[in-house]
Swiss-Prot record:
Domain of life: Bacteria
This protein's GO CC annotations: cytosol
Keywords: Iron, Metal-binding
Species name: Albidiferax ferrireducens (strain ATCC BAA-621 / DSM 15236 / T118) (Rhodoferax ferrireducens)
Annotated protein name in UniProt: Iron-sulfur cluster assembly protein CyaY
MF annotations from Gene Ontology: ferric iron binding; ferrous iron binding
Record has Metal-binding as a keyword: yes
SUPFAM superfamilies associated with the record: Frataxin/Nqo15-like
Entry's family note: Belongs to the frataxin family.
Amino acid sequence: MNDLEFMDRAENLLKAVETSCDRINDQTLADIDSQRVGSMVTLVFSNKSQIVINLQKPLHEIWLAAKSGGYHYKFDNKQWLDTKGQGEFFANLSRCASEQAGCPLVLNS
């Protein structure tokens, strides 16, 4: 994958995260403040905990930082997969967000 393809796929992922947060805020009592600055999205929960998602263009990776730890993802044909075999990006983001929000949440593409 070249830089242009990476940025296109990565930007689509960040937009999907923001759209998922808007949907969750509209449909549930969860309150997720989604803040975008350049190639980074920060999700702030009502308990003030945060999840940070940012693009690592030189590595063609997306990094996710949550209370449970840090995760790195590379695009593999159709999805973003953890570089250490820990699963798919949106499944892990949903798990981390649910833990930090204290209620079940689903973020997806």
